[in-house]
Structure formats: structure tokens, C-alpha cells
Amino acid sequence: MSIRRKLLAAIALLTLTACAQSTIAEQKPTVSQPADSVRQWWCYPLPGAKVISSFGKRDGRGHSGTDLKTVPGDKILAAFDGEVVFAGTFSGYGNLIRIKHANGLETYYSHNKKNLVKVGQRVHAGDVIALTGRTGRASTEHLHFETRIDGRAVDSARYFDHNSHTLRLSAFRKTKSGYVVRK
């Protein structure tokens, strides 16, 4: 195993551990909001990854997600609790998983080498749902990560800081049943 692969594996392991002890960008827990109330309800979908293409215009057309590069076959994690509403092949997405979350939020995970979940399955933040690949319209192994609100693609950077792999808590609001995305 090359030094680069070992380093990426170590980073992924450390980040995966951080999933269970997630830190949050832009807001720290306070006495009235204990640390446990902001942990374990979200996870960065591909620990150790780097952004290789952002949301927005690309090559004269729209790009509806954020492309995250890592080593082939890496574990893709569910970003939030939810229900799998699609797991199969879909056009340029290749192998795609769509997960429906609370308050109109859906996350898409595509170009997967292998999908590991089935339609109707409930998943929790941090569950392994797929392996990174190069299916569909993809020029390299990566994860195309997409967030949608009520069916409309929105920049996932609204919810995640892709450099630090942290959550932007300001994009969510707390309810009796947990956190939901602000519309």
C-alpha cells in the first residue's frame, strides 16, 4: 500500500471517528444546548475527500452537485437520517442513491461503484450506503453529492463546509424531533 493510500486511509478513519463526535461550524454548544444535542444527527458523506468540482456553471451548463474526490472504492456515508427512495442506475448519474430526509431535504449520491442500500430502507447519519466509483457520466472515481429542497437542487455548501468537513448549523433549525433544514 502506497504512503498516499495509507495517509488517505488514516485521514478517513480519523474523520469517520469525528462523524460520531461531529463538530459544527459557525456555532458551538452552550449550557442551554448540551454538546450531545448537536452530535450524531449528521455526517460528512465522504471523509478525507477534496472538492474537484463545485455546484453551479461548468462547461457552459449547470452542475447540480459537488464532486468529491478520494480513492476508488471508498465508503460513502449517509449525511443525515432518512429513507432510501431510489437505489439504482439513472442516466448520467450512473449508480445513484437518493435519500429523503425531514422538511423537504433530499441528498443524492452518484457515480457509485456499488450501492449497498435498498429502496425503503431507513438509514442513519454515518451509515455506509455505497462505494465510490466511476459509473454514468464520470471522468474519474468520485462522489457526486447533491442536496435538493422540495426537488430543487441547492448548493451543498449551504449546509456543509467542504474544506473542514463540518456542518453549517445556521442552515438548520431545531424542532421537538431534532434538527431540520431551514427553507
Regions found by a protein language model. Give the residues of each.
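Residue-level recognition of beta-strand microenvironments
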Residues: S54, A87-G88, N115, T132-T135
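Zn2+-dependent peptidoglycan hydrolase active-site motif and core
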Residues: A78-L116, E146
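Surface-exposed, glycine-biased beta-strand/turn segments
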Residues: Q21-N95, A125, V154, L169-K183
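Conserved, short, structured surface segments that act as functional micro-motifs
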Residues: K69, I97-H101, Q121-S177
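Short acidic/polar mixed-charge low-complexity motifs
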Residues: D74, N103-L105, R152
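Bacterial Sec-dependent N-terminal signal peptides
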Residues: M1-P29
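Peptidoglycan cell-wall recognition and remodeling modules
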Residues: R61, T107-K113, R134-E141
